[in-house]
Amino acid sequence: MPKVGMREIRRAQLIDATLRSIDEAGLPGTTLASVAQRANISTGIVSHYFGDKDGLLEATMRHVLRDLWSATTRRRVAARKDPRSRLRAVVAANFDDTQVSAPVMKTWLAFWSQSMHDPMLKRLQHVNTRRLHSNLCAEFAKALPRTKAREAASGLAALIDGLWLRGALAGGPIDTRAALKLAHDYIDLLLASD
């Protein structure tokens, strides 16, 4: 008889091992066997929980996305209610510690690349993109006309992605302070122009 709660513990253990494997070996070097080895379990158990490598990557990205969405919610709730503060909260969530560790950043890069070829991952990316744009647009709409709010949201989303991508590819820890300053300056510029 399986232990109560063991399924979630085991899944979390395997997702962590997947993040570490992608960090160390990249997506091509990440196999069910490499994940099993890092988790000190059999390959059969990995297959039991995730089916195949695609299922494992999907579950790992769902985990990373949940962390992002949790950080976004937590920071928006804690922020003052004015649009500037709430926009800054959304930006900060994208540079949250849960999103800028080397294993997570490399997994994001692998996910983006793979999402161009995998319909399920493409759908996850589409949901994430829409959620970011919606959060930004809702806040900009409190201070700008609708069309300007949409344009501002698209611009800030592109800036977030660009700053994050440059940071991920820089070869060292991401300078979140510099990224946040640039994004905050952009928000201030957009809100001051109205």
From Swiss-Prot:
One of its GO terms (biological process) is negative regulation of DNA-templated transcription. It holds the Pfam family TetR_N. InterPro entries: BetI_C, DNA-bd_HTH_TetR-type_CS, Homeodomain-like_sf, HTH-type_TetR-like_transc_reg, HTH_TetR, Tet_transcr_reg_TetR-rel_C_sf, Tscrpt_rep_BetI. Residues 31-50 bind DNA. It comes from the Bacteria. This is HTH-type transcriptional regulator BetI. Transmembrane segments: none annotated. GO terms for molecular function: DNA-binding transcription factor activity; transcription cis-regulatory region binding. NCBIfam families: betaine_BetI, PRK00767.1. HAMAP family: HTH_type_BetI. Residues 8-68 form the HTH tetR-type domain. Repressor involved in the biosynthesis of the osmoprotectant glycine betaine. It represses transcription of the choline transporter BetT and the genes of BetAB involved in the synthesis of glycine betaine. Pathway: Amine and polyamine biosynthesis; betaine biosynthesis via choline pathway [regulation]. It comes from Burkholderia cenocepacia (strain ATCC BAA-245 / DSM 16553 / LMG 16656 / NCTC 13227 / J2315 / CF5610) (Burkholderia cepacia (strain J2315)). Keywords: DNA-binding, Repressor, Transcription, Transcription regulation.
